[in-house]
Regions:
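Helix-start/capping segments and mature chain N-termini
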Residues: 1-159
């Protein structure tokens, strides 16, 4: 991930998408569905078009937004996790920690809540959607379907 100090990494500008699109292209060429981008110190920053979460020991862990756009979906997942009593940590994640995670998933407008099966051909957890990812995914889908009154403020109904 291109560091903020080399440009305007926190601006939602067309020029900032080139790095992500090239990473996605390289990932697809290598046989993967998505790319994980790392910051200038080698920690996971985000996916090419989504935020990244892992689950370890019952807690959600997601990188800070030091070098990425702030995400409404990421913030919503953090809020839903609090409602579900799931602890959330905002801290750096090493590539090696991803390999030993219990679960992992992407979040974003297009990704919504997408479970991750493997990273670098290493199976994450049991190799399928884990129980915490399932809880978060279910709560998120209820939210966007208007089934959770607490989050009605997030919805705009269109006739």
């Amino acid at each position: 991930r291109t560091p903020n100090t080399s440009g305007m990494g926190k601006a939602k500008a067309v020029a900032n998408y080139l790095n992500s699109q090239m990473a996605k292209y390289e990932a697809v060429e290598a046989g993967y569905d998505e790319a994980l981008l790392r910051d200038d110190q080698g920690y996971i920053a985000e996916a090419s078009g989504a935020c990244f979460f892992i689950v370890r020991d019952g807690a959600l862990i997601t990188p800070p937004n030091d070098n990425t756009l702030e995400s409404i979906t990421q913030a919503t997942v953090i809020e839903l996790a609090a409602d579900l009593g799931i602890p959330v940590l905002r801290r750096r994640i090493s590539r090696e920690e991803v390999y030993i995670a219990d679960e992992a998933f992407f979040t974003g407008t297009a990704a919504e809540i997408t479970p991750i099966r493997d990273v670098d051909a290493r199976i994450i957890g049991c190799g399928s959607r884990g129980p915490i990812t399932e809880q978060i995914q279910s709560a998120y889908f209820d939210l966007v379907a208007g089934k959770n009154e607490k989050y009605i403020k997030y919805l705009t109904y269109i006739n």
